[in-house]
Amino acid sequence: MASCAARGPAELSKAQAVRRIGILGGTFDPVHIGHLRSALEVAEFMGLDELRLLPNARPPHRDTPQVAAQDRLAMVREAVQGVACLSVDARELERDKPSYTIDTLESIRAELSGHDQLFLVLGWDAFCGLPAWHRWEELLQHCHILVLQRPDADVEPPDELRNLLAARSESDPTAMSGPAGNISFVWQTPLAVSATQIRQLLASGKSVRFLVPDAVLAYIEAHELYRAPN
């Protein structure tokens, strides 16, 4: 798989020894340009070898997805087709239990070398909600955390996260070293699009062209997804 950032000859031996893998989870109900733009910007800025979009099965802190897991997975696969360094990881959909991020991180970490860097990409709201996550204090044992910044964020982090940021924050995300253990912030292009908005438009019979990739729109139309009940 092609890396998101070209490396010069001086970096070749390091690139061979240490892989840089990012994961971006979500229900992707459906996947849209906001998800994809954030993923690509992070991958390119961080020079990741791979950024995996990881569809959630039954996320404990989210509403049940509107369409079946196989449809959401298929749409994500359509969305990243031909995009260098973006890929799909379906492991959470293969579990017959709630999707806990700590389990996923442990599973992925077991497949990597001890030197490989793993980056968990989170939106600001998700990051502020970390203290409600299962075994959240263990996350940084397995990965670095990259928090997507946006100018309209209006959620304040709880005290537990303020303390964690004071101890583990790195001002330059590209300077994070080691396989895991730090938190940093990455700017994202603000795009006012959401899966909820897209579902509402589709249910009302309106077009979502240019809000989702053409291949995803074709899949939605072919399978008659997100239509209002008759």
Curated annotation (Swiss-Prot):
E.C. numbers: 2.7.7.18
Disulfide bond residue pairs: none
UniProt keyword annotation of Transferase present: yes
Domain of life, source organism: Bacteria
Catalytic reaction(s) noted: nicotinate beta-D-ribonucleotide + ATP + H(+) = deamido-NAD(+) + diphosphate
Record keywords: ATP-binding, NAD, Nucleotide-binding, Nucleotidyltransferase, Pyridine nucleotide biosynthesis, Transferase
Signal sequence segment: none
Pathway: Cofactor biosynthesis; NAD(+) biosynthesis; deamido-NAD(+) from nicotinate D-ribonucleotide: step 1/1
One GO biological process term: NAD biosynthetic process
Claim: RNA-binding is one of the keywords in the record: no
Enzyme kind, highest EC tier: transferase
SUPFAM superfamilies from the UniProt entry: Nucleotidylyl transferase
GO molecular function, one term: ATP binding
Family per record: Belongs to the NadD family.
Function statement: Catalyzes the reversible adenylation of nicotinate mononucleotide (NaMN) to nicotinic acid adenine dinucleotide (NaAD).
HAMAP family: NaMN_adenylyltr
UniProt-listed NCBIfam families: cyt_tran_rel, nicotinate (nicotinamide) nucleotide adenylyltransferase, PRK00071.1-1, PRK00071.1-3
Protein known as: Probable nicotinate-nucleotide adenylyltransferase
Protein species of origin: Pseudomonas putida (strain ATCC 47054 / DSM 6125 / CFBP 8728 / NCIMB 11950 / KT2440)
